[in-house]
C-alpha cells in the first residue's frame, strides 16, 4: 500500500545499504530508493526491473534523484538543460514505480555561485520542472553545500508551490 506524501512514515531507511529494504520492512520505516542517484541507471531497464521487484512490501517510498554533475543553477545553459532532462527522467521513473516523493539536490557549489544567483536560478528551474509534474508529487530539496538553511527557505518561498518542500540531511549539515 502506497502512502500519500503527507501520511508517510517519519523515519526512512536509505537504500544505499543492501540490508535497507529488510530493515525498512522489519521496523515499518519508509524506504529511499537510491539506485537512480546514478543518472545512467535511469536509462537501464534491468535496473528499473530490479528496483520494482525489490519494493514488494515496502511503504513510504522516496526516490533519490541523481545529483552528480546536475546543476539546476548552472551558468551554462546546456548544463542546466541536462539537469532538467535528468530530473524529468526521474519524474518518469517515479511515476512508473508509483512513488510520489523525490529527494533532489540543488547543485550549489561554494565559491562558484553567489547565493543570490543560486536562489534566483533555482526558483526558475524548480518552477519549470514542476510546471509539468503531477499534482500528487512532492519534491524535497535537500541541503548539501548551501551556506545555511535560509538559502533553501528562500528558494521554497520563491517557487511558491506546495509540491516543493525541504529535506534536512544531517550528514550534509556537518
Where do the PLM segments sit?
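Structural preference for beta-strand elements that scaffold enzyme active sites
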Residues: 8-12, 28-32, 60-62, 99-103, ...
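N-terminal pre-domain/capping segments
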Residues: 1-89
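Short linear motifs at secondary-structure transitions and domain/linker junctions
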Residues: 5-10, 35-39, 115-116, 130, ...
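Active-site acidic/histidine proton-transfer and metal-coordination neighborhood
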Residues: 73-165
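Active-site-proximal loop/turn and secondary-structure-junction residues that shape catalytic pockets
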Residues: 15-17, 35-37, 67-69, 106-110, ...
